[in-house]
Amino acid sequence: ELEVYVKHREAAFEGFSEAAALYTLQTSVTADKPSVLVFQLWFNANLGASDLSYVTRQQIPEISNLQKIRDAILVMPDSEGHLKAFGESVTNTSRRLTPELKPRYLRASLTVLENHPAGEPARELVLHYNDLLDEVKLVAQIDGSDEIGHTKPFGLFIGLRHTSDIEREAGGFARYLVGGSSTGTPYFYPRYPGQRQAPRDDLEEHLGKKLGENFEVQSITFHDTKIQSRTIGEPGWRETPLAYVLLKAKDASVDRIPELQMDLDFYDSLGPVLLPVTTATQIVDARPESAPARPLDGLELMQTLDSRLTGENEGLTLELHATGKGLTPPLDKLVTLDIPDFEITKTDDQGLSIARVESGALGVNAVSERTWLLTLKPTADAGESL
């Protein structure tokens, strides 16, 4: 249970603090060479585990304890020597870290080192990471109004907005659309120790889990790996569309779309590194029973009639199939169902589905389709005209 875990974790942190105090007492009466073992283990534990091989992506550093480590070093007789040794230890350890842990490790180390010269290698790398993240953003955009209601689905566009320079340096971002079963793709994605699956599969899992907390995730449709980035009307910036998520709020209390995250792979002076990019939280209104109609263009409606009528109690079957760029609305919003000499005894809605997603100079669209099967029976006064 979380309560038990927190209790044991705090006890462990207190144990590290006491060990650091005992070490400080020892060094005050000896002239031993500075050792940062206790501080390094304490620091590692703040990242999630004293053995860094057990640290997971989901764990967040305990910033308050990182400051305590710095304070414990500063009260030592040879605080300068210990800060220098700690910085050297951070530099050496960072060469052996997994790509996903390295950025968190180095950022956390600067809370302890601050502006000390021994932290210069870490500062240079963190500055490099910040520069990269200034040039690429993960974006989530609602397809239509943010008044989503709670009875009908709506769509969410997922994409990367980035500078032309970083797109060129990274070799494009379409490689993040490579799935584990993809074949014939021109893109290569690097495999890292501890990486579980292909980038698209990783993103799909994250979207399903994160959005699934408050929404019914009806489908996630990805763009093709051959997609090209598109201009967005901002000089020097482009967009690579990734996916379209079909969602429905679970109830009227839903008030936001949560922060979503995606890992991007780059290289620094030590090797590969994974940097997370996140979307901004978006406020939505799920209270209305009926939300505004979603954008729709290029609507096509096809009718297929099975006119075979072989028995007095049998009816005709009329199939209506609608497609369009956007979300196809319910049948009563599309047509007026007034068929002379027939009554509709049954309407079978096959449901809304996303056939594909398209991207072009004018925008990004989800092409949806919806099929209804109507059972028609002649009215009593239809007479011999049938």
Question: Which ranges hold each PLM region?
Answer:
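Surface-exposed interaction/ligand-binding surfaces
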Residues: 2-386
